[in-house]
């Protein structure tokens, strides 16, 4: 939940920065969501294969340290003043997240018994849902009171804390005898094999389709909440951060 809550600070900050750099252009603000989505989509199949070839715990630590360094570098260098830099920040943070998520998903069955796996997945899903409300509300309040830079710094700290916590966890595979080969040809064969597995099983392909439809509708909803929140005035705060945070809770 530390990461999920922290993510809202940066996501909300990027929306506000994109609006500030473009005179609150809805297209520019939507560009933040578009950059994140179009970076995730082609990248996750590749980063997912890394979790079959390299230690998952190490990948999670590296992903969080990378995101921490990126955020601190952008803050210290003042590289968040142009629309291009906001999009670049969004893209780089997605690289870290796309590396972290598959490693975390593959790590869980290695540290849980089979009868514990359902509960563990439910806790992760519940934590993600709770963090949407908690993170959005906290981010909206903090950024409206203390500014975008403070919000970005808070998220950078959550990446560092997460990396430290993960480093204390047990090894989560893959074991040396389980690791796949790392050649590019084998990696792309695995991608096509994965899609073949999905398409041959209607019950799985329906879940994948539903996930895609939910993401499309959810993205549109988030965008509308952002626009409404930026136009609303909560407690005479003109930045729109509080408005977005309250509506996203």
Predicted regions and their residues:
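Alpha-helical transmembrane-bundle signature of multi-pass membrane transport and export proteins
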Residues: 1-249
């Amino acid at each position: 939940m530390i990461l999920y809550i922290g993510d809202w600070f940066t996501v909300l900050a990027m929306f506000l920065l994109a609006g500030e750099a473009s005179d609150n252009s809805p297209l520019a603000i939507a560009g933040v969501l578009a950059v994140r989505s179009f970076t995730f989509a082609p990248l996750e199949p590749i980063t997912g294969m890394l979790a079959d070839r390299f230690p998952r715990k190490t990948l999670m630590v590296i992903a969080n340290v990378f995101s921490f360094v990126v955020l601190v570098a952008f803050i210290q260098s003042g590289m968040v003043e142009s629309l291009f830099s906001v999009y670049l920040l969004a893209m780089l943070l997605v690289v870290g997240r796309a590396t972290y998520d598959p490693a975390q998903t593959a790590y869980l069955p290695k540290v849980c018994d089979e009868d514990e796996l359902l509960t563990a997945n439910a806790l992760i899903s519940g934590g993600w849902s709770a963090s949407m409300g908690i993170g959005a509300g906290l981010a909206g309040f903090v950024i409206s009171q203390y500014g975008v830079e403070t919000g970005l710094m808070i998220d950078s700290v959550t990446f560092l804390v997460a990396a430290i916590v993960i480093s204390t966890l047990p090894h989560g595979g893959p074991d040396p005898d389980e690791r796949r080969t790392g050649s590019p040809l084998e990696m792309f064969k695995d991608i096509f094999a994965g899609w073949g597995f999905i398409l041959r099983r209607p019950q799985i392909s329906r879940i994948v389709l539903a996930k895609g439809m939910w993401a499309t509708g959810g993205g549109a909803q988030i965008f509308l909440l952002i626009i409404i929140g930026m136009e609303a005035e909560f407690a005479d705060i003109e930045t729109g951060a509080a408005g977005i945070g309250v509506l996203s809770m």
